């Protein structure tokens, strides 16, 4: 468990690739620089796709967890 308090939450449960990352892109766009987004997903491909997304665009993946088929990610948006 983390002590991160997100500024926004993206619930992508039940969605499959590429929808979670497409929604993530839109949510990050709407987040203020330095803002924290929590992503909840059930698609196992997010374990690969979300870290790559963050790395490619320069956002910080602070933590990721898996619990009974649910994947949780805490992403800090890069500064402008």
From Swiss-Prot:
PROSITE patterns: UPF0033 (PS01148). One of its GO terms (biological process) is tRNA wobble position uridine thiolation. Pfam families: TusA. CDD domains: SirA (cd03423). GO terms for molecular function: sulfur carrier activity. Its main location: cytoplasm. SUPFAM superfamilies: SirA-like (SSF64307). The active site is at 17 (cysteine persulfide intermediate). Keywords: Cytoplasm. Sulfur carrier protein which probably makes part of a sulfur-relay system. NCBIfam families: PRK00299.1 (NF001423). HAMAP family: Thiourid_synth_A. Belongs to the sulfur carrier protein TusA family. This is Sulfur carrier protein TusA. It comes from Pseudomonas putida (strain ATCC 47054 / DSM 6125 / CFBP 8728 / NCIMB 11950 / KT2440).
């Amino acid at each position: 468990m983390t002590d991160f308090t997100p500024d926004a939450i993206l619930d992508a449960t039940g969605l499959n690739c590429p929808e979670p990352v497409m929604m993530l892109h839109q949510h990050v766009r709407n987040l203020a620089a330095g803002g924290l987004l929590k992503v909840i997903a059930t698609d196992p491909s997010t374990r690969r796709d979300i870290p790559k997304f963050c790395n490619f665009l320069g956002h910080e993946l602070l933590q990721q967890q898996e619990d009974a088929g649910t994947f949780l990610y805490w992403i800090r948006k890069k500064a402008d």
